[in-house]
Curated annotation (Swiss-Prot):
Pfam families: Darcynin (PF17074). Belongs to the darcynin family. The lineage of its organism: Bacteria, Pseudomonadati, Pseudomonadota, Betaproteobacteria, Neisseriales. This is Darcynin. It comes from Chromobacterium violaceum (strain ATCC 12472 / DSM 30191 / JCM 1249 / CCUG 213 / NBRC 12614 / NCIMB 9131 / NCTC 9757 / MK). InterPro entries: Darcynin (IPR031409).
């Protein structure tokens, strides 16, 4: 997986264990980036990798979010 992540250094990833808190999933990956195309390409590369094409993992949900988005929105409205 390291070669895939190395191709997209502008995307940062953090892993969280969730199995004690959720019956829906055992792990959560949080990706952070300012480059939507880099995120898109990284996810496509992961989907094409043995990690996802073999029955090891499956993507359950992809939930896009913007940190402090409401603050940016309010600031934009105030202009």
């Amino acid at each position: 997986m390291k070669p895939i992540y190395a191709r997209y250094p502008e995307v940062r990833m953090r892993w969280f264990d969730a199995e004690a808190f959720s019956a829906r999933c055992s792990d959560v990956a949080m990706f952070e980036t300012e480059s939507v195309p880099a995120f898109y390409y990284l996810i496509d590369a992961l989907r094409d990798s043995p990690l996802m094409t073999e029955p090891y993992f499956e993507f359950v949900d992809i939930i896009p979010a913007v940190e402090d988005g409401f603050r940016d929105y309010d600031a934009q409205l105030a202009q």
